[in-house]
Amino acid sequence: MSLEPQAAYEAVVSEMIATSPTASGKMFGMPCLKNSNGKAFAGYTESAMVFKLGGPSHAEALALPGSNLFDPSERGRPMKEWVVVPFEHSSRWLEFARDAFDYVANKK
């Protein structure tokens, strides 16, 4: 049984809240996940998830077909650490959410 985009996002939210100090919130008007310090590390927009990633995880996510850097202003100024991963790769969303959580937690 395949999930719809919103349901797939909600499954990631439920799992992250159950397994890490995570809360749901808003960022740029979109639903997002934040760590216990209130730092956003993932979000949901237009049937895709966005993740704040670094290193190999960033490169891996960006290399997926249809993925791109997140540009919330839509003015050609993408946020270099944030990658949009479309629904077609939703089977990887939880993996990237965990990587993003760790990346934000360990960022100096």
List where the protein language model places each region.
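Charge-dense, helix-prone N-terminal extensions
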Residues: M1-K108
